[in-house]
Structure formats: structure tokens, C-alpha cells
Amino acid sequence: MSETTETKFTPRFKTKYQETVAPALQEQFGYANVMEMPRVVKVVVNMGLGEAAKDSKLVDNAIKDLTAITGQKPVINRAKKSIAQFKLREGMPIGAHVTMRGDRMWEFLDRLVTLALPRIRDFRGLSDRHFDGNGNYTFGLTEQSMFHEIDQDKIDRVRGMDITVVTSAKTDDEGRALLKALGFPFKTN
């Protein structure tokens, strides 16, 4: 029998965090314990589909786009209440979201920072004011075409999305330092 040695693949951003970012954060903030250091816990990509109330095909196309971008199947968000003014009935699909953890999360962050964000037209950097007070960062993208996985010719409708990077940081300064060290392009005011 032949022996096969399986080499475990480690995402580039995860290696960067372990080798350079974590020691730099420990030195900057003076953490005594390794578990005190802020780290990325999960990334949530949310796509609102308000227009799906009129056309159900939009949900399928949005799911295909989110699946291509994130690499996993999204969960459909459904309306909890009926609202007549919005022509919305209880149980109708109004959005989709994906929660990524582990290696898939690190790969997505790598693709987002190195490939997708630089492709945005007139991109001057992310605002550093979108932290929530607990070190989590949320920002919106206006279109899905900046991701290489989306075929430009097959886009039926421009869809935006919200991306939330949840960290274990206790303050916004720790979260900002973590994301800046990972390579997030924040604006310099």
C-alpha cells in the first residue's frame, strides 16, 4: 500500500493573523493572556430582498449570487408579520444571509480585502466609523459585481449587501487595530 501524506491547507489570512497580527496586537495592547487578544469570530453577509415580494425569481438569483460569493448556501429570511402597506405577507422571503466561521471565513476575508474592495469604482477606503461599540464592524456594498465569482453578463439586477465582521474585541479601538492589521483599507481622515 502506498502512503499518502495529506498536507493541511491553512488560509493565508489565518496564517497572517497567527504569525504577525496577534503578536503585534499583544505588544500594542499589552495582553497578559493569549485568549484576551481580539480575533475574528465570524463574518455575516446579509442581502435584503425587499423587491422579492413582487417577483419570486429574484430570490433564486440572489441565493445563487450569495452562494457563489461565499461558498455556502444562504438561509432565507422570512417576514414575521404581514404589513399591508408594503404588500408583504407573513412567511414571504424578504432576505438571505450567510454566517461563515473557520477557514471559509478567513478565505472570504482574504478575497474581500485583496480582490473585491479594490474593484469598487472610486473606492477611497472603508469608513472607520461603522464600529458598534463592541469591536464589531459592519459595512455595506452597493453591488455584487465586484466579486470575481459573479459573471458580469448574467447579473439580472444590482443587489447590495451588508457584511458584518464579528470580533472578540472589547472596544472599537481593539477591533479597528485588528482589522487594520489584517489589511482592511480604512480611510485616513
Swiss-Prot record:
GO biological process, alphabetically ordered: translation
A Pfam match: Ribosomal_L5_C
Keyword tRNA-binding: yes
UniProt keyword annotations, A-Z: Ribonucleoprotein, Ribosomal protein, RNA-binding, rRNA-binding, tRNA-binding
SUPFAM superfamilies: RL5-like
GO CC list: ribonucleoprotein complex; ribosome
Stored InterPro entries: Ribosomal_uL5, Ribosomal_uL5_bac-type, Ribosomal_uL5_C, Ribosomal_uL5_dom_sf, Ribosomal_uL5_N
Nucleus recorded as keyword: no
Gene3D superfamilies linked to this entry: 3.30.1440.10
Single Gene Ontology MF annotation: rRNA binding
Function according to Swiss-Prot or TrEMBL: This is one of the proteins that bind and probably mediate the attachment of the 5S RNA into the large ribosomal subunit, where it forms part of the central protuberance. In the 70S ribosome it contacts protein S13 of the 30S subunit (bridge B1b), connecting the 2 subunits; this bridge is implicated in subunit movement. Contacts the P site tRNA; the 5S rRNA and some of its associated proteins might help stabilize positioning of ribosome-bound tRNAs.
HAMAP family given in the database record: Ribosomal_uL5_B
Record-linked NCBIfam families: PRK00010.1 (NF000585)
Family indicated by similarity: Belongs to the universal ribosomal protein uL5 family.
Assembly and binders: Part of the 50S ribosomal subunit; part of the 5S rRNA/L5/L18/L25 subcomplex. Contacts the 5S rRNA and the P site tRNA. Forms a bridge to the 30S subunit in the 70S ribosome.
Name of the molecule in the record: Large ribosomal subunit protein uL5
Organism: Kocuria rhizophila (strain ATCC 9341 / DSM 348 / NBRC 103217 / DC2201)
